[in-house]
Amino acid sequence: HETDPDGQVMSSMIETLMFLQKEYANLRYAFMTVNNARSFGSGSERLYVSNKEIKTFEPLKEICEEAGGHIPSPQLENQNKAFASVLERHNKAAYLVVGDSANFTNWAAGQPNEADGTCVKADTHGSWHSASCDENLLVVCEFYFIL
């Protein structure tokens, strides 16, 4: 005897499978797009992305971490160039973090100057400047890719 005479269970399963196949294709496309942008853009394992918001330094860490990223911290010249290209595209400066043991820095002439502030911002050319942590700057987050 049949337990699904009208084929409703089978139809529902087919519909669900088709939906999942479409979702998989969309996710695969999104992943490949990001992966290709990463390898095309800078040859670096880091991707710099802005949500176009303007914020002070304080909320930046939480915003980036909620998105799965970090406050930008370029460690190499090509990473700083990739970061600067985002700033140039938006024509805005953004915060970054400079580690204590940084091998790479890109301070502008006369910088760092703590009289200007204890935070660090990069201008649209990728040059670093001391800045007030209360400045409203472009939100940019850094994402790591290890593929």
Swiss-Prot record:
The keyword Lipid biosynthesis belongs to this UniProt entry's keyword annotation: no
Carbohydrate attachment residues: N103
Source organism, top-level taxon: Eukaryota
Disulfide cysteine pairs (residue numbers): C64-C141, C119-C133
A GO term, aspect molecular function: carbohydrate binding
Compartments, record wording: Secreted
Residue span(s) of domain C-type lectin: 62-143
InterPro entries: C-type_lectin-like, C-type_lectin-like/link_sf, C-type_lectin_CS, CTDL_fold
Principal subcellular localisation of the protein: secreted
Tissue occurrence: Expressed by the liver.
Keywords: Calcium, Disulfide bond, Glycoprotein, Lectin, Phospholipase A2 inhibitor, Secreted
Gene Ontology, cellular component aspect: extracellular region
Transmembrane spans: none
Function comment: PLI binds directly phospholipase A2 in the presence or absence of calcium. Inhibitory activity of the PLI-A homotrimer is more specific than that of the PLI-B homotrimer.
Subunit structure: Homo- or heterotrimer; homotrimer of PLI-A chains, two PLI-A and one PLI-B chains, one PLI-A and two PLI-B chains, and homotrimer of PLI-B chains (with a ratio of 1:3:3:1).
Family, per entry: Belongs to the alpha-type phospholipase A2 inhibitor family.
Name of the protein in its database record: Phospholipase A2 inhibitor subunit A
Native source species: Protobothrops flavoviridis
